[in-house]
């Protein structure tokens, strides 16, 4: 099974059109999707998971928008598969050169060692790594994650590593590498196998420049 050609983002407001246009030049033949909070709740209603009821209530139980976005990306990717990218990140290469035939990929964080940068994740539907992350998040109270903001990033890294130790090994997976260069504007993300910068995360002011390569 291959990663479906679905490219999804979420934020309260729709991204500016120039940003969507930039993305679409890198995702030809892919379907671009964006969800705001109301659309996320509708998605939960239209795509229920019987074992995980009352997902809208769980969504609103988190104080931070970042954690609500985490829950949605896990849920969407578990249901449909595809690629999720944060709205403060931008592709520099054609998405197909990253996805290839992987069943799961994301980014190894250099800023928070032992965690995954969840701003860029791709996987097949019902992927076991994402399934574990979704169930773990569903069962984690808001009070716990308030005290450990990057808990889900850490747990996703653990689930990725655990996958190597289980009988049903998801061998066709990959982590890109975020570089820690003390850049005050963005963090570059590299495909270290090919020594190519594939994505930039504009973590500082969260503004995507118009003049990217």
Enumerate the language-model features and the residues they cover:
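Small-residue hinge/turn detector
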Residues: 70-82
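Glycosyltransferase-associated regions of secretory-pathway enzymes
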Residues: 1-69, 85-213
């Amino acid at each position: 099974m291959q990663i479906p050609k679905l490219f999804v983002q979420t934020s309260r407001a729709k991204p500016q059109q120039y940003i969507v246009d930039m993305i679409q030049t890198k995702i030809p033949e892919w379907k671009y999707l964006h969800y705001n909070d109301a659309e996320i709740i509708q998605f939960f209603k239209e795509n229920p998971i019987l074992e995980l009821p009352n997902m809208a209530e769980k969504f609103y139980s988190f104080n931070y928008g970042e954690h609500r976005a985490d829950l949605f990306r896990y849920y969407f990717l578990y249901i449909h598969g595809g690629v999720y990218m944060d709205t403060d990140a931008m592709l520099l290469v054609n998405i197909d050169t990253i996805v290839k035939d992987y069943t799961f990929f994301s980014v190894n964080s250099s800023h928070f060692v032992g965690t995954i940068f969840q701003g860029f994740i791709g996987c097949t539907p019902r992927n076991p790594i994402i399934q574990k992350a979704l169930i773990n998040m569903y069962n984690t109270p808001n009070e716990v994650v308030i005290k450990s903001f990057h808990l889900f990033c850490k747990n996703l890294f653990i689930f990725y590593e655990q996958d190597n130790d289980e009988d049903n090994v998801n061998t066709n997976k990959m982590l890109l590498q975020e570089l820690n260069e003390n850049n005050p504007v963005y963090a570059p993300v590299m495909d270290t196998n090919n020594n190519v910068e594939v994505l930039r995360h504009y973590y500082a002011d969260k503004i995507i420049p118009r003049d990217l390569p």
